[in-house]
Amino acid sequence: MMIGLTGGIASGKSSVAKMMEELGLPIVDADQVARDVVEPGMPAYEAIVAHFGTGVVNDDGTLNRKALGSIVFQQEEERRVLNEIVHPAVRRQMQQQKEQLIRSGEKTIVFDIPLLYESNLFYLVEKVLLVYVDEHTQLQRLMNRDQAGKDDAIHRIRSQRPLESKRDRADAIIDNSGTLDATKRQLIDILKRWKVIPEDQ
């Protein structure tokens, strides 16, 4: 079974991914893949430098994410160009990892994709598992975690699709407003229901 794990910023999705890993499930991490495909020498890296110029490259040859970010944040057309370079490379790499894991005998694979809805990557997965918290909890956690001011935190939360609107397409929802133990119990119940782990685990 291919499971898409998603959530919003500061929803606690990473904690759930860690729990799934501890249960022995292989994780394909979209954020890590997105970092890997823009490493020096990779085709996406070369395409970014060709388009945006050497101003987005650090002295050590790696991408200067801050410089690139300030360009694409302000200019929608440049953001579209960047997405057209990076997104296909990420999809290809994730597909390759999926095929590799299937060849090695894995029956269940977890795709940790923060922007599963926004990137429309549903075709990769059979089930969507949404890690949910209400916006008030999300705001408090983000401010505590990143030492962010309230306005900045609200802006970052609102730049993503609201968690509330993601509930409709989720096959299962974990309410992560409580303790980690409560979250883990919900996760295990869902995985048993989906027959990913045995009933007696």
Swiss-Prot record:
EC numbers, comma separated? 2.7.1.24
Which residues does ATP bind? 10-15
Instruction: Tell me the enzyme class.
Output: transferase
Entries under SUPFAM superfamilies matching the protein? P-loop containing nucleoside triphosphate hydrolases
Reaction catalysed?
Answer: 3'-dephospho-CoA + ATP = ADP + CoA + H(+)
Q: Does the keyword Cytoplasm apply?
A: yes
GO CC terms on record?
cytoplasm
Its pathway?
Answer: Cofactor biosynthesis; coenzyme A biosynthesis; CoA from (R)-pantothenate: step 5/5
Identify this protein by name.
Answer: Dephospho-CoA kinase
Query: Which gene name belongs to this protein?
Result: coaE
